Amino acid sequence: MTIAMAVFRCKSDQEQGELLAWLGGDDGLVKTRVYDGCQGIETLSGPDSVVALYERWESVEHHQAYVGWRMENGLGDLLETWLAAPLEIAYYDETGV
């Protein structure tokens, strides 16, 4: 299993709210949770209009296929309106500690 951390640095609290609304809507995380390889996802919010996704995936390749599918279907355009900086994605392995 792979952990993917996606960090969205929104332009303001308004854009953060719009992103969270989209994530909670019919085109958001409901589709992520049934995408091939997704084993779970949690949404976090932080200071300075940040949203982070803690995602559990079967593999890095599964997550990258998912991100590619999202970008092909218009998410990149939406992110440009909401984000002050490019989307950040990092991958981690669980240590069992």
Regions found by a protein language model. Give the residues of each.
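Short S/T/G/P-rich N-terminal loop/turn motif that feeds into the first structured element of a domain
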Residues: M1-V51, E58-R70, A84-V97
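Anionic, Ser/Thr-rich low-complexity intrinsically disordered regions
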Residues: N73-L79
